[in-house]
From Swiss-Prot:
Cross-referenced NCBIfam families: rpmI_bact
Family classification: Belongs to the bacterial ribosomal protein bL35 family.
Gene Ontology BP terms: translation
GO molecular function, one term: structural constituent of ribosome
Signal peptide feature range: none
Name of a matching Pfam family: Ribosomal_L35p
Protein name: Large ribosomal subunit protein bL35
Transmembrane annotation, as ranges: none
CC per GO annotation: cytosolic large ribosomal subunit
InterPro entries xrefs: Ribosomal_bL35, Ribosomal_bL35-like, Ribosomal_bL35_CS, Ribosomal_bL35_sf
Keywords assigned: Ribonucleoprotein, Ribosomal protein
PROSITE patterns on file: RIBOSOMAL_L35
Amino acid sequence: MPKLKTKSGAKKRFKITGTGKVMYAQAGKRHGMIKRTTKQIRNLRGTTTLFEGDAANVKKYFLPNAR
């Protein structure tokens, strides 16, 4: 059976860390920022890790060749 291809949308959105966690950029910063507080905007910066159950599904179905 041939190897499964990685979903191209997933490889742009997720990164696998050295310990196997899945990192992603937080949503909610594209538009409509005027109604959010500075604290809300600041807390959306950077990346965060997916929950373990969601990370398992991402690695299994969308990034099958990741470690």
